Amino acid sequence: MADLQQLIKNIEQWAEDRNLVEDSTPQKQFIKLMEEFGELCSGVAKNKPDVIKDSIGDCFVVMVILAKQNHIDSVLEKISDLDSSFEKISDLNSFQHVFELGVEEIIVETVVSLGMLASELMGPNLEMPPQVDAIFGWPCLSLKLISRKYNLMLTDCVQAALG
């Protein structure tokens, strides 16, 4: 099983092979993210673990493509270190409330952060601003949180999405 860092490299190569990095727009990728996130919400609403697993992986893939498209290496580095970062923050009392959220609450919070991302994508220069790390942070963390709620590993979800 590949680690998250290797999976991100695989996603980047997969996206470049399909011209999704250079020949697509952040707006198109965001719409794709909304499609995949909608499938995740449907899987949660209908309690379909297979749909949840696939959708978590698909959302993650699109988030990586969005970050790569916008040359946001710092986001990709943070995402690739998500597993160890997740373990570190799960031990901090100040973040304990995040781990106590229910899946529905996580999804609602994710919608808020995705709205902020959409707002940034529609900015005047259509490129992501420096504070994008924080905007990307919650959706990526939420995918990890949701996968945990369903006893899934994020890496397994991403691997399944890649086939």
Curated annotation (Swiss-Prot):
Pfam families, per the entry: MazG
Domain of life of the source: Viruses
Protein name: Uncharacterized 18.2 kDa protein in rep-hol intergenic region
Organism: Haemophilus phage HP1 (strain HP1c1) (Bacteriophage HP1)
